[in-house]
């Protein structure tokens, strides 16, 4: 199933020490086909992911591999979506 995930970071100043590992894990998730697309808003600390997972819990588990998420620095809300094309 496909999901749209909205991630918000309440304290972006705390992200810096984890950027390298975050980038590595994101690349892994993309290579595994979990993260299909990643977008960032330019004016706010918000990211959007398009994911493919078995269900919402699987998506949470996969996104939970990200250091920002593990450290509580980025929180996601997940919504199942239907692929039209």
Model regions: which residues?
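Conserved, structured core segments of small domains
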Residues: 1-85
């Amino acid at each position: 199933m496909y999901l749209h995930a909205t991630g918000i970071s309440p304290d972006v100043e705390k992200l810096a020490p984890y950027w390298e590992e975050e980038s590595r894990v994101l690349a892994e998730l993309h290579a595994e086909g979990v993260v299909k697309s990643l977008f960032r808003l330019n004016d706010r600390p918000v990211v959007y992911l398009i994911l493919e997972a078995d269900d919402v819990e699987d998506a949470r588990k996969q996104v939970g591999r990200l250091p920002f998420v593990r450290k509580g620095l980025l929180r996601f809300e997940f919504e199942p979506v239907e692929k039209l094309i």
